Amino acid sequence: MRSTSTFTRTPAFLLHTLARWLLVWGVLGSSVVAEKKCASNYYVRSLPGQPDGPLLKMHAGHVEVDHKNNGNLFFWHFQNRHIANRQRTVIWLNGGPGCSSMDGALMEIGPYRLKDDHTLIYNEGSWDEFANILFVDQPVGTGFSYVNTNSYIHELDEMASHFVTFLEKWFELFPEYEHDDLYFAGESYAGQYIPYIAKAILDRNKNTTTQAQSRLWNLKGLLIGNGWISPVEQYQAYLTYAYKENLIQSGTDAAKRVERAHSECISELDSGGKDRIHAGACEKVLSAVLEVTRENGKCINMYDIRLRDEFPSCGMNWPPDLKHITPYLRRDDVISALHVNDDKRTGWRECTGAVSSNFNARNSKPSVQLLPEILESGIPITLFSGAKDFICNHIGTEQFIHNMQWSGGAGFELSPGVWAPRHDWTFEGEAAGYYQEARNLTYVLFYNASHMVPFDFGRRSRDMLDRFLGVDITSIGGNPADSRIDGEKGALTSVGNHPNSTTAEQREKEKLKAATWAAYYKSGEVALVVVAIAAAVWGFFIWRSRRQRQGSGYRGIYPNLNGLSSGSFSGFRNKRSSHDDIEAAADFDASELDTLRGTDDRSRGANGHGSVGGDSEDEDEKFGAQKESYHPSNMPSSSSS
C-alpha cells in the first residue's frame, strides 16, 4: 500500500479545514443577516396589479422603534421619478389617531390608485415626480404597524420620540436620503403629529454633537391639509360653518339644538378646556349637526358636505376607492410583496380603534402652541383647506391663523392694521382657490374640495407642492401646467401624465453614461494588470510542473484544482446574480445620480380621519374600514381621514 507523505496530506487537510470554517461562518453570517436587515431586504421587486411598464423603485417593510414592547412602524417608500435641482423627501402621515397612511398612498398623493380590488392605475398628479415619498403607518398599532397588546402609546411626545427613532434607523438603512431636503405633509389629526415631530427634529439637531454634525437632518418645511391643530377655534367653527353653508337655518328647532350644544362647548372651553386637544362637550356639536341633517336614513357627509351617507356613518363609507383598498392590502401576495412581518397578526385596517382609544393625549398641549416657534426658527409652513370639509373646516383654520402671534405680528398682518392680501389662484383656466402668506406661513384654500384635497384635485395639489418645494421646470424640461396667481404664471410646474423624461434627466443620463465608461476604462486597466499577474503565476506553475513532472509536487497537493476553481467561480456568479445584489446594483445607480445632481440651494419663491368606535377588533370589523377623525368618542359608531 502506497504511503502519502505529510507534505502531500497537509494542503488537503488545510483545504478541508478552510471549507469547514467557511461553512460555519456562512451559517453564522446568515443568522446575523436574518436579524439585521439591509436595504435589499426591503426592496419591492413586484407589485400585484401593477400597470404596464417598468415598476417604480420602491421599498417597504417594518422598522423597530420599541424593542421592549415589539413596537414596529411600517413604511412604504417611492423614489422620485425625475431629477430636480436637488434631492427632496416628503414624509406623508394620515391622521386618526390610528388611521393608516396607506390612505395617502393609494387614494391621495401616491403614484398608484386602485381601479378595483386587484388593478392599480397611475395617479395623475402624484407627488413623486420631483420628490421621494415616504408613507409611514404610525403610531404603533396603526395600519400595518404593530405593537404588543396593551402597549399602545398615549401622548404626542411619545409619538414624536418613536418617529425620531424610526428616522434614525431608516436613514441607517437608506443613508443616501439622509441629506435630502426633508418635508412633512399630512392631513386631519396629522395636524397634531407633524408639529410635534418637527419640534423633536429641531431639538435633535440642536443637541447633535460637533462630531455628528454631518447627521443633521435638513428639515425644510411642513404642509398640513384640513388639519386638526387648534381645538379652541376649530370647535367653535362648527356652528359658524353650519350656518354659512346652510346646513341649518336660524330659528329652527334643529338650529336651536345645535346652538345648545355649542353653548355647552363654550362652557367646557372656559372651564380649562382651552389647553386640551379633546373636549367632549364640543364634539357633541358636530354630532348634533349630523343628527339634525338626518333625512330618510341619511345624513350629510362630514368630509364633503355636497354628499350624503347612511346614518350614522355620515361620511365614513367615503371615499369610494376605500372599498378596494382593504381587500387589496389583505391579499397574501400584496402582503408578501410589501414585506409585512409575520408578527403583524391581524389584517390591514384603515383605522384601528384600539390605537384611537388609547391615544387620548390628555397631557399634550395642542400643536398650535408649537407653530410660532417652528415658524420663527425659519421653517416655512403651508396650511391648506378643502372648502367643502366640515369636520376640520376652513373657517376654523382661518380663525386660528388670525389669532396666532409669531415673528412680531398676529395672523397675516404685514404691519399694524395692514393685512396680507388674498391672491386668486387659477389652474388651467378654472378658479382653483386663493393663496395668502406672511412671515413664513402660507394658507391655501381649495375651492370645491373635500377633507382629502389630493383625492379631489391631484394635479392642483401637486402644483401647490411644487410651488412649496421651489421646483421650477424652466431649467428641467417638461410640459408646464397653466397655473396662475393673480394672473401671473410665476415658477413653471409640471404636473400629471408622468412624462418619461425631462431635459435635465437626459443631461444627467449623459453624465452617468460618461462616468460609466470612465469606470469601465479604469476597471479595464485594473483587469489587464490582474490578467498579466495571473498569466505570470500560471506560467510559473506550468514551468514548475514540467520540471517536477516525475515528483509529487503541487499537482499532487491540489488534485482537483480545476474542478474547485470552476465550482467556486460558478457559485460566486450565482450569488452575484441573486436578488440582493440586483438591488445593490440598483442602489448604486441611485447613489451615482445623487453625486451627479446639482447642488444649487438657492432659495425659491414663497411658495381624521379619527377612529370613532370601540377598542375591540370585532367593533372595527363591524363598522368596516374606519376613517380619520379627531373624535375618539361621542361620535356615530364608526370612524374617518
UniProtKB/Swiss-Prot annotation:
Function: Protease with a carboxypeptidase B-like function involved in the C-terminal processing of the lysine and arginine residues from protein precursors. Promotes cell fusion and is involved in the programmed cell death.
Originating species: Coccidioides posadasii (strain RMSCC 757 / Silveira) (Valley fever fungus)
Annotated signal sequence range: 1-34
Disulfide feature: none
PANTHER family tied to this protein: PHEROMONE-PROCESSING CARBOXYPEPTIDASE KEX1, SERINE PROTEASE FAMILY S10 SERINE CARBOXYPEPTIDASE
Comp. bias regions, Polar residues: 494-504, 631-641
Topological category with respect to the lipid bilayer: Single-pass type I membrane protein
A Pfam family the protein falls into: Peptidase_S10
Positions of the UniProt region annotated as Disordered: 487-506, 593-641
This enzyme's EC code(s): 3.4.16.6
Keyword vocabulary terms for this entry: Apoptosis, Carboxypeptidase, Glycoprotein, Golgi apparatus, Hydrolase, Membrane, Protease, Signal, Transmembrane, Transmembrane helix
Matching Gene3D superfamilies: alpha/beta hydrolase
Protein name in the entry: Pheromone-processing carboxypeptidase KEX1
Gene: KEX1
Catalytic residue list: S188, D389, H451
Reaction(s) catalysed (UniProt annotation): Preferential release of a C-terminal arginine or lysine residue
Regions of this protein lying in the Lumenal compartment: 35-522
InterPro entries: AB_hydrolase_fold, Peptidase_S10
GO CC field: membrane; trans-Golgi network
Similarity section: Belongs to the peptidase S10 family.
Membrane-spanning parts: 523-543
